[in-house]
UniProtKB/Swiss-Prot annotation:
Function: Cotranslationally removes the N-terminal methionine from nascent proteins. The N-terminal methionine is often cleaved when the second residue in the primary sequence is small and uncharged (Met-Ala-, Cys, Gly, Pro, Ser, Thr, or Val).
Native organism: Sordaria macrospora (strain ATCC MYA-333 / DSM 997 / K(L3346) / K-hell)
The protein, known as: Methionine aminopeptidase 2
GO molecular function, one term: initiator methionyl aminopeptidase activity
Signal peptide range: none
Amino acid sequence: MAAQAAPAEELSKLSVEETKPVSAAANGNDSNAESGDEEGEEGTTPAAGAAKKKKKRKPRKKKKAPTSQSEPPRVLVSQLFPNKQYPKGEEVEYVNDNLSRVTNEEKRHLDSLASNQEFLTDYRHAAEVHRQVRQWAQKSIKPGQTLTEIAENIEDSVRALTGHTGLEEGDALVAGMGFPTGLSINHCAAHYTPNAGNKMVLQEDDVMKVDFGVHVNGRIVDSAFTVAFNPRYDPLLEAVKAATNAGIKEAGIDVRVGDIGAAIQEVMESYEVEINGQMLPVKSIRNLNGHTISHYSIHGTKSVPIVKSNDQTKMEEGDVFAIETFGSTGNGYVHEEGEVSHYAKRGDAAKVDLRLSSAKSLLKVIDKNFGTLPFCRRYIDRLGQDKYLLGLNNLVSQGIVEAYPPLVDKKGSYTAQYEHTILLRPTVKEVISRGDDF
């Protein structure tokens, strides 16, 4: 774990006082000391003579704060933006009936007020951390790496850039990982991260979804991309990226989520990919959805389908949405399968009288370190907890903690994912996680 860097405002206070000069004799340099023969001249002693020849040291220059990110990322983002003016996301005007919002004076005033709210600064801070970490990850992820290495590289970087290692009680609730790094390969579409002892290695022919969240004060930025090294999968990745952008374009205040799903599906399923001489259609995974994001909760109350539906739920001003799409060369439908790694405490969990002592103690750890933020077993491990699985399973069975098993399509198929977080501001939608990469 990288050492925490000092904030820029603290660095600016660390001006170095001019060092008091030290005599050459005091430094052990006898050649510059006055000789004993001069002692009688004007009553000057050798020490006094030496004092006359004190050398002034040049004042040390103040250490400059970093102005660019390191590789791997270890520089606090707050140091790179000491005035907290973090970059805005992509601002997109509303279409059709919502165009009037841009010229409405009252709406502009409300948007100005919203821009000053602390939550927007926190969101942009989290988004900048996500951008810097993922852009490095896209360059650094290579075949031959273990999934554990990839996940820990991303997570260490997020913690370094937010300045919160998450090892002190409550520290991870201030800022850091919004949810565990998902590294779902090939037919596995979501909710896979390595548990302790996992030896899985990324292969040249794999298609891996990289899905991780960053939060600052509970404002979660959720964004994902897909890594593939074999160019034959390019049409699959292009289909999903284009479908996500279609969903973002369609999204807006008063827009029905069913219409967004139709727009996503139309784009997604216009693509096909050739694998082993066979042309395969790209299908939207119909039982996976986008969703709203709430304070300290990755899944809010609204969902955004990625296929056409009759869902009449409307997006509303002030909503925060994760627009994510999944494409598959398989059935276009996922089911739960495999060892669980992702968990989250339920926000609506009823109070239960726990009889198992290990469950009681683990719940305290979860409350103090994660709250309702999702976590994985590796996060519990790094807090020094052991022999907790029985207690964790008990919390799941009691309905206090939700388990999220891996979601998979049929074996032999390939899946891809792209995702952005958007804010529905009064006059524009801000694609808060947009970057030069996607």
